[in-house]
Every structure is written in structure tokens, then in C-alpha cells.
Amino acid sequence: MDIVRERYEIAIERIKEISTENISNEKYQEYFSKVAKFILKLNYVKDEIESGRLKKYTTEQLEQLNYELYEDIYKENYKTSLANPKFACEELGEEYGRILCYVYKKIRDLIGNVYRQEIEIVTLRIELFIELFYYFENSEELEYRSIEEAVYSFEKDNTEIFVDDMVDWRVNPKRTFAVDIVMNSDLNDIRYLYMYGEHIGANEIGMAQYLNSLSQSEIDSLAHVYTEGYRKGFVIAGKDLSIKDTVDIRYNIGFERIIKSAILDFEKMGLKPIIYPLGYGSTMCNKQYWFDHKFDEALYLDKAFVKRKLEVAKQAFENRKDLALKMAGPAVIEIFGENPFEPESKKEAYKLTKEQQKLSAGYINEYQRIVQEHIPGDQRSFTIIAFPIPEFGHNFKEMFDATVKINTLDSEKYEIIQNKIIDELDKADYVRVVGKGDNRTYINVKLHELNNPEKETNFENCLADVNIPLGEVFTSPVLKGTNGILHVSEVYLGELKYKDLEII
């Protein structure tokens, strides 16, 4: 038995005790008992996976297990869930409620790690939970500062493990968890959906069933539009795809038949698939849960943490510089048709201070610079294609078919049409955009001056390569001279719905 597994077994034995142990403060006892029992459920899943029994489950058994793992955050249960910061603070007090809610959320995040059999990360999180229990076990000596320091030290001390693992997933083709599900499962048997460990709902099941109703030639045609757009992106930009070995594939669970065909297409281009945990996913069973925990890093985000995280990220990429250099870029299948989400902003949820917002933005910028250094932008490309999901409504199938038609329009025909649009736009000094109806947009967009209009253009003719479908001409405007009002009555950005967004 290796040292990590030994630590895990010791931790699980302690969790069994905690699940039934009495502590002096009853409100904390209920919290630790509930979370400990959830950890034991994860341990049960781990055993079922390692023994091979999980693959023999019926569809009904898999559906029930998936329900048990996610039921606490379903909308109908979330109001009284300890994963809800508002309820946690009501039950445990505002001081300890928020931080214990955060700890429970991180334990819940381990579902995916368990399915991927990432025992070290699972062990670390369980050990932190046990450490915190010891503090609350002696509640007369309990100090919030001790709890906060324990969590902060844990996050900072283990940054190397977490970030190194994240980077490895993104560039290492030997991490084949999702690839194995796609390539080795019987995709006509929807039980495969439950092997990811993600929440599986009507969208994932409905999408898989609909794609299973299509012929293989129809599936191959859809996949080819996606992969050919990726290949064309390199050709049009004059970039050499032959020097690359891997492609970053991203999709929503349920699209596996298309992804399997696409992987075979990419292999013909000499590309091996990389599908990392955030590259696949399912539609959220409760977006309020996601929103409530969106800024949990406020608990520990400071200069020292950011500095350490960037050091680790840089070293992680440096250790894999050959793998990183071989990454060709992302091939993304996006989805649309989800019901609108208007979040409730809760005072109990963590929020970033202005200083932390600057630190977060600085981290993102510096991390992107590290990525750019190891996966140079002038050597990579991408493609994005989107499809509706069953949540779109009763006419989902009609919309899916219409989307396919739009995604497969004749590029040669529309290249001529879009070039004529560009020829006219290139004659302009600026473009005036005026909103229709209730839209208040009235903006002049300044264009770059062309020194040689016969050979130069301000606009990109987008023809179903990096952005699918075609039908777009775009430019980068001159900021000086661009002025007016840009108004959007309704827009979705990062899972959130914004109303009457206006920039002056």
C-alpha cells in the first residue's frame, strides 16, 4: 500500500467515527455528521469503481446514485442545504457558517476526483475536514482565526499539487479519462453518461438519445464541419498544423457520438485528443449554487497566495514545455437554449474586495502570459461551433436541424457575398450603428485608415473556420474617435443574464 492510499484509509476510518461522534455544540455536530456521511458516500463510490461493479449497474441504479450525490444542491433542497451560504450562516452563525459552507462545497467538488480516481486530492481535502473537526470538538477553545489560518495554509501549501495537476491535464495526452469514455463505451447505451461523475439531467440524456437517432453518416458530417473548421483555421492563418501533436477538445456531456467521430478525424491530422475535467461538463442542476460560490477564493486570496500560484504554474508548464509546445489549441462545442438565470446576490456569500479584484485580474493576466510563453499564440488556432440542447423547448429537434443547415452553408458562395460587404465598408471613415426599436445604441465606430486600399482591408472575412457558422465580417476599431452609446437590452455573459447593459 503506497503512502497516499494508507493516509486515505486512515482518514476514512476517522470519518466513520466523526459521522456518529458527539461534540458539545449540537449545531456543529449536525454539520460534521452530515458532511462525514457524504464523504462515506464518496468512499462507497470509489469502492464501486475500483471493483468494477459500477459498470454493471443498471440505468436505474446509476440514475439513483447520481441523484444521491447531487440531491443536496437541487433547487428544491438547496434552501435548507449546508452548501447554501445563507442557510449555513443561519444554522452555524455568520462567522463560522461561511467558512464551513466553503469546506463542504470543496468536499462536494471531490465527486469528479473520485470518478477519475485522483486519490491524493481526495485525501488532502478529507484530511483538512478532519483537522477542522478537531478544532470544533473542543469548542470552548475555538477561535475563528485558527479555522481561517488552517484553510489558508491548506490552500497555499497545496497549491503546487492542485495547479500542477491542472496544467498536466491540459497538455498531457496520457490523461485519458474522458477520452476512454468516448472511445471505449457503447454510446447507444446511455449508461456511459454516468461514468464521468458529473450531474446527469434531461439535457445530457436527451442530447445523447437524439444523436443516437441519427445515422453514422449524419454524425460524421457534423463532426467533419467541426474538425474541418479547425484545420482551415491553421491554413487561413498560415500556421503549420503538422508541428502539433494534440488538440484541446471541449464539449457538453451528451455529444459523445460527435466527439468520437471528431477524434477519428483529428487523428488523421496527426492530433491526439486532450479532454480535461473543465473541458467536459454538464448543464448545472442549480446555477444559484454556482453563483453563491463564485468568489469563494476571497477567503484566502492575497499577494502571497497569487505569487505562489504563479510560481507553481510557471514551473508546471516549464516541466512540460515539450508537451505544451505541441498543443494546437481548443476545438469547442458550445451549447445554447438554457433557461434564463437571474441570480440572487446573498450577503452571506464571499465577495472579492477591490484589492482582491485587482489581484485576481493580475493573476489571470500573468497566467495567460505564462500560457502564451509555452503555447505561443502565433502557432495555435481554435474553432467554436454551437448547438441547441433539449432545454431549448418542444421545437428542439427543428432548431437542431436548422442549426446544422446554418453550420454547413457554402463557404465559397458566402465568401463572395461577404467580400462585397467588406469592399463597401473599407470605403468608410467610420461605421454608425443605430439601435432598432427600444434599443438605445447610437455609436460611431472609427476605422483604421488604409494606406493601400487595393491591398489592405480593415475587415476579416469569417468563413466557418475558427468561428462556425460563417456570416460574419469583423474588425478591431480605433478607440480614439469611437464614441456614443452601446446598449444591449438582454445578454448572457458567463452564465449570467444582464438586462439593459449600457456603455457610454
Regions found by a protein language model. Name each.
Residues 1-483, 493:
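Active-site bordering "gate/hinge" segments
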Residues 478-504:
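Long, well-ordered mid-to-C-terminal structural blocks that present hydrophobic/aromatic surfaces
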